[in-house]
Amino acid sequence: MLKYLVQRRFTSTFYELFPKTFPKKLPIWTIDQSRLRKEYRQLQAQHHPDMAQQGSEQSSTLNQAYHTLKDPLRRSQYMLKLLRNIDLTQEQTSNEVTTSDPQLLLKVLDIHDELSQMDDEAGVKLLEKQNKERIQDIEAQLGQCYNDKDYAAAVKLTVELKYWYNLAKAFKDWAPGKQLEMNH
């Protein structure tokens, strides 16, 4: 099955590669992560390059699909590309959305600046906790957007999620006095 889907990759979706997790083969937001991981491991055991001929391409496609679907940001970007042909992985598209909400960028930059000036771990942990809560809130809102087919709101939330994910990376890189880079 996987071999067939990989060979006709141009018509298949990542959801089709995991028929037990997604029996309807339709893009959905809410995912049973443990079921996805279990099915991924089973398929990987069958199609790993060491186990099957032509396994390298199949394994690579399977890896890409799994990592896209398990990560909320990448999943949302993928769903928007699939459902509305909006590619938020392209910087220009993402920037167009950001310019429509300059307050978002200012808020992210303010928090990033505050983080770079911090010298105590307790303050950083508090900011990091607040950022994790923002991310969880946006992920919940995205679920509602996809259920309601409100793709315009999903676009804005996905761009916002990308900024908060990048800020989460800055928390991991933080050390007192260390210069932090801000990616967007």
UniProtKB/Swiss-Prot annotation:
<keyword id="KW-0496">Mitochondrion</keyword>
<dbReference type="InterPro" id="IPR001623">
    <property type="entry name" value="DnaJ_domain"/>
</dbReference>
<dbReference type="GO" id="GO:0009060">
    <property type="term" value="P:aerobic respiration"/>
</dbReference>
<comment type="function">
    <text>Co-chaperone required for the assembly of iron-sulfur (Fe/S) clusters in mitochondria. Stimulates the ATPase activity of its specialized Hsp70 chaperone partner SSQ1, to mediate the transfer of iron-sulfur clusters from ISU1 to GRX5. Binds to the substrate protein ISU1 and targets it to SSQ1.</text>
</comment>
<dbReference type="GO" id="GO:0051259">
    <property type="term" value="P:protein complex oligomerization"/>
</dbReference>
<dbReference type="GO" id="GO:0044572">
    <property type="term" value="P:[4Fe-4S] cluster assembly"/>
</dbReference>
<dbReference type="GO" id="GO:0005743">
    <property type="term" value="C:mitochondrial inner membrane"/>
</dbReference>
<keyword id="KW-0809">Transit peptide</keyword>
<feature type="short sequence motif" description="HSP70 binding">
    <location>
        <begin position="48"/>
        <end position="50"/>
    </location>
</feature>
<dbReference type="GO" id="GO:0005739">
    <property type="term" value="C:mitochondrion"/>
</dbReference>
<dbReference type="GO" id="GO:0006879">
    <property type="term" value="P:intracellular iron ion homeostasis"/>
</dbReference>
<dbReference type="Pfam" id="PF00226">
    <property type="entry name" value="DnaJ"/>
</dbReference>
<dbReference type="InterPro" id="IPR009073">
    <property type="entry name" value="HscB_oligo_C"/>
</dbReference>
<protein>
    <recommendedName>
        <fullName>J-type co-chaperone JAC1, mitochondrial</fullName>
    </recommendedName>
</protein>
<dbReference type="Pfam" id="PF07743">
    <property type="entry name" value="HSCB_C"/>
</dbReference>
<comment type="subunit">
    <text>Interacts with ISU1 and SSQ1.</text>
</comment>
<dbReference type="GO" id="GO:0005759">
    <property type="term" value="C:mitochondrial matrix"/>
</dbReference>
<comment type="similarity">
    <text>Belongs to the HscB family.</text>
</comment>
<dbReference type="GO" id="GO:0016226">
    <property type="term" value="P:iron-sulfur cluster assembly"/>
</dbReference>
<keyword id="KW-0346">Stress response</keyword>
<feature type="region of interest" description="Interaction with ISU1">
    <location>
        <begin position="71"/>
        <end position="184"/>
    </location>
</feature>
<feature type="transit peptide" description="Mitochondrion">
    <location>
        <begin position="1"/>
        <end position="10"/>
    </location>
</feature>
<dbReference type="GO" id="GO:0001671">
    <property type="term" value="F:ATPase activator activity"/>
</dbReference>
<dbReference type="GO" id="GO:0044571">
    <property type="term" value="P:[2Fe-2S] cluster assembly"/>
</dbReference>
<dbReference type="GO" id="GO:0005758">
    <property type="term" value="C:mitochondrial intermembrane space"/>
</dbReference>
<dbReference type="InterPro" id="IPR036869">
    <property type="entry name" value="J_dom_sf"/>
</dbReference>
<dbReference type="GO" id="GO:0051087">
    <property type="term" value="F:protein-folding chaperone binding"/>
</dbReference>
<dbReference type="InterPro" id="IPR036386">
    <property type="entry name" value="HscB_C_sf"/>
</dbReference>
<keyword id="KW-0143">Chaperone</keyword>
<feature type="domain" description="J">
    <location>
        <begin position="13"/>
        <end position="82"/>
    </location>
</feature>
<dbReference type="InterPro" id="IPR004640">
    <property type="entry name" value="HscB"/>
</dbReference>
